């Protein structure tokens, strides 16, 4: 296996759209430069990896968090679909990009292109600090929303291994410093969801303190990354005509729980480089299993590992997912109905 990592532009240098940039572009597009960097890197790997012992017909892309969102976007972009043989996404999925028009208005507020080009790069970077530059439907890298492409089955039709962690978010992000009581939880959900609060509370109930913590953590996780990742898996399973393998990573790192990014050291096999934690034999066992599953998927498109529990494809609505922990096992996801409610509300209000 040959591993390639690539850098790409971020922030104002990676996603700044401006009407004057659009006008001078041969593709009549601006913004998404960081994603175009990734396409260029992918094309370079395709053109050159044979010289390093790799196979250009067997390129699997992977990423975590924003990197996972990038994997999703590369799968749906017309610029990169034909370069991909497989994909791995960890804790990041379907997003709702801005329109090019709104991204251009955001950029135009910074001034004219001539004024910006007259500034040193360091000044531009400093002035842009604190501003958000979104991925946009620019008509070139993205021609429509990722959900639309996935719903129509127009994405790269390749095997997909995708999942998220058990504690991507915390109930404290909903309740803040308030005690996790049912009344405070219901009030917080009411403030956030208004007329939809009853539907959310039925899906994520909080009838006692323990349930408030569990449902609040699930809701916060869904709002952060889990829902978008789940939606990616469901849409790809429905339309992609290739197997989709879904996981939920639940191994706690120290006493934090399976927080966002906790799986990275396990998946990449570099626990020993992080000396903050007193890793145990159980941690090593989780890491070994995760590395084997991921490596075999990269090589074959199927994470079947002799001696480990079978990881079934998740191409049916009630298909099981792999729980990655000290003792890997499959479960039918209990959270799926709650996620479906939240997704339907998001879709309703996006119209």
Feature-to-residue mapping (PLM):
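Serine-hydrolase-like catalytic core of hydrolytic proteins
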Residues: 1-113, 140-141, 147-175, 241, ...
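Short, solvent-exposed turn/loop segments enriched in Gly/Ser/Thr/Pro and often Arg
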Residues: 9-11, 62-66, 247-255, 309-315
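A structural signal for well-ordered alpha-helical segments within the folded catalytic domains
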Residues: 36-43, 69, 105, 226-230, ...
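Surface-exposed helix-capping loop/turn segments at secondary-structure junctions
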Residues: 49-58, 114-115, 234-245, 296-312
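Short glycine-biased active-site loop of nucleotidyltransferases that positions the nucleotide triphosphate
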Residues: 76-81, 255-259, 313-314
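Substrate-gating cap/lid region and adjacent catalytic-acid/histidine neighborhood
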Residues: 115-283, 293, 300
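Mature extracytoplasmic/periplasmic domains
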Residues: 304-332
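Tryptophan-rich aromatic "cage" segments
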Residues: 327-351
